[in-house]
């Protein structure tokens, strides 16, 4: 094939693609030209099949079906935290859940965010996936802490808030952390941590220091808004800054070292509590296009963003504003940067979830100046990506879960199964052709099963139709669609109750007015626990009988995404009858280690 379409195809860029419903989308030449320019000169992408190589199998130990609890760490309340859940809360939760038989705690991405702009709080839009968010530090657990370092009136306000006040939390924690650092003699990160983290740690700490300087000067926390001379981390301006602010950069390295130490203690707390898997960490599909991970990094495509094509829910497609890894760089290196990323995360994890796992094969890319409706897919070296992933998984004995929702290419789930990557199966989506809920036995064994995720309503929210009301309120669906969905929801509830009855888990009526009774909620969780899926996760929000979503996709400031806190403390929630009823129901199907 000649012309721009042929050159694009040589690089793995698709001149056309099949969308949901089988529609063929032809990509504008202008998009192909911009993507070809962004990819740069290089060898043609080698042809490859959608298949798992036989030498790329992730760690998947034999053993009983396990269960655990999915937690949004920032949501946790306790008498001692600072208005946001922290690593010490995680230790305490591990002791409680491990004692009840849980084998893992699933967490939202803990990636490093923008400390100079803490209101940018989506954990799926991080500054850098290699490092951690210091706002999760339990400051009071760092040696040398003195309660006099904090403003108690401000602390009580943060602790009592219904929503996480990220700017307030960041101000309180960074002030105290600087005081601790000063009192301790302004230490750097430990030599061992610096050696393990390499030059990436230095670059990230430099970014955080420059970001604070730029934000204070009104240029914003992200590098794409900085003056031109500051956009090159290897330029003279940045070099002069690094020389003049060496202590400041050491402070940011020290923060990462402290976060790594506390996460390691949480991992050890899981082991002490008897958990077979321990921490289950989430890996975002990319990094913010203006974050430290893309600041002058040769393995990241510049001027290109990850998104999603048009579908039934988003007619114009989606722009996630995330920078992708370069397919050419992955092919040239055997996907070494991806492997290093995964190895770094897996060092503290017994399991990881890869967000948008289809990115191992292809990502939907959008060049600058183009809307998502004009984007297209680009292929990655699947064999190399899978081998790098499997190597990290086996080196660290870490189970891998792939989020395989949305537009999944035919054959991709078979690739996951062949590579020992667990599928991600959600009760709300596991339906038959008539809209009924499939029986537990129809779920695959190589899977993690759950009721819902952070992008979906809680069970109480779904039952009450709160998700429909919220989407209508914020204009995500029109009045006609809202009415149709509201009229359909009672039928969906009855279908679920019938599935429970068919499974021998419910002997009550089909029509249940008002909120679902606790025994029905327990029965639904037992239904999911009965599946042959290797792992089963229950959301802490469901255990707490919360009806609010933590994230409402396609909203920004309209809804407080990633900010709702649990209404009760960890001790109050885990001590409730509703919590115990659900845990008992799960353990009836998955007794595990007793």
Descriptions of predicted regions:
Residues 102-109, 270, 278-284, 345-360:
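Short acidic catalytic loops
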Residues 1-75, 80-101:
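Mature N-terminal, pre-catalytic/accessory segment of carbohydrate-active enzymes
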Residues 89-113, 347-351, 528-530:
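Catalytic domains of carbohydrate-active enzymes, especially glycoside hydrolases
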Residues 545-594:
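Structured C-terminal cap/extension of enzyme domains
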Residues 22-26, 108-116:
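Hydrophobic alpha-helical membrane-insertion signals
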Residues 62, 89-106, 264, 268-278:
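Short, solvent-exposed loop/edge-beta patches enriched in aromatic
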Residues 252-286:
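Conserved, well-ordered alpha-helix/loop/beta-strand core segments that scaffold catalytic motifs
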Residues 58-63, 70, 116-260, 286-535, ...:
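Alpha-amylase-like alpha-glycosidases and glucanotransferases acting on alpha-linked glucans and related
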């Amino acid at each position: 094939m000649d012309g721009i379409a042929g050159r694009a195809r040589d690089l793995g860029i698709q001149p056309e693609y099949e969308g949901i419903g089988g529609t063929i989308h032809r990509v504008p030449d202008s998009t192909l030209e911009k993507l070809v320019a962004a990819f740069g000169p290089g060898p043609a992408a080698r042809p490859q099949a959608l298949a798992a190589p036989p030498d790329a199998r992730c760690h998947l130990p034999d053993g009983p079906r396990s269960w655990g609890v999915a937690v949004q760490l920032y949501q946790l309340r306790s008498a001692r935290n600072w208005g946001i859940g922290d690593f010490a809360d995680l230790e305490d939760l591990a002791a409680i859940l491990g004692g009840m038989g849980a084998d893992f705690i699933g967490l939202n991405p803990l990636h490093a965010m923008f400390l100079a702009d803490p209101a940018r709080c989506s954990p799926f839009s991080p500054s850098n996936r290699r490092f951690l968010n210091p706002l999760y530090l339990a400051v009071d657990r760092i040696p040398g802490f003195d309660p006099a370092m904090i403003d108690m009136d401000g602390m009580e306000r943060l602790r009592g808030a219904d929503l996480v006040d990220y700017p307030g939390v960041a101000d309180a924690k960074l002030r105290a952390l600087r005081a601790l650092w000063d009192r301790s003699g302004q230490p750097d990160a430990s030599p061992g941590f610096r050696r393990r983290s390499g030059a990436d740690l230095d670059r990230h700490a430099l970014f955080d220091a420059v970001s604070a300087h730029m934000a204070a000067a009104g240029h914003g926390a992200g590098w794409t808004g900085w003056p031109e001379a500051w956009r090159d981390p290897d330029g003279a301006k940045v070099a002069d800054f690094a020389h003049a602010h060496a202590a400041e950069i050491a402070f940011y390295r020290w923060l990462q070292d402290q976060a790594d130490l506390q996460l390691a203690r949480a991992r050890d707390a899981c082991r002490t509590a008897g958990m077979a898997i321990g921490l289950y960490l989430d890996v975002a599909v990319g990094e913010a296009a203006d974050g430290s991970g893309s600041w002058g990094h040769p393995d990241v495509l510049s001027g290109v963003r990850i998104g999603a094509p048009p579908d039934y829910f988003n007619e114009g497609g989606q722009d996630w504003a995330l920078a992708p890894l370069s397919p050419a760089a992955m092919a040239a290196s055997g996907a070494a940067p991806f492997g290093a990323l995964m190895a770094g995360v897996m060092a503290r994890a017994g399991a990881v979830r890869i967000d948008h796992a289809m990115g191992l094969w292809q990502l939907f890319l959008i060049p600058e100046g183009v809307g998502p409706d004009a984007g297209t897919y680009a292929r990655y070296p699947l064999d190399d990506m899978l081998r790098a992933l499997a190597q990290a998984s086996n080196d660290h004995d870490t189970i891998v879960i792939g989020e395989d929702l949305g537009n999944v290419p035919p054959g991709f789930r078979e690739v996951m199964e062949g590579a020992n990557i667990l599928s991600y199966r959600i009760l709300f989506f596991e339906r038959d052709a008539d809209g009924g809920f499939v029986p537990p036995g129809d779920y695959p064994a190589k899977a993690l099963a759950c009721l819902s995720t952070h992008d979906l309503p809680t069970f109480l929210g779904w039952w009450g139709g709160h998700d429909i009301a919220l989407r209508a309120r914020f204009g995500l669906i029109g009045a006609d669609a809202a009415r149709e969905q509201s009229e359909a929801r009672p039928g969906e509830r009855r279908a679920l109750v019938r599935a429970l009855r068919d499974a021998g888990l419910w002997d009550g009526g089909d029509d249940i007015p008002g909120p679902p009774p606790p025994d029905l909620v327990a029965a639904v969780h037992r239904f999911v626990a009965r599946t042959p899926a290797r792992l089963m996760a229950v959301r802490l929000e469901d255990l707490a009988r919360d009806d609010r979503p933590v994230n409402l996709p396609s909203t920004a400031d309209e809804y407080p995404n990633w900010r709702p806190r649990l209404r009760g403390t960890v001790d109050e929630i885990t001590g409730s009858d509703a919590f115990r009823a659900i845990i008992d129901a799960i353990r009836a199907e998955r007794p595990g280690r007793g």
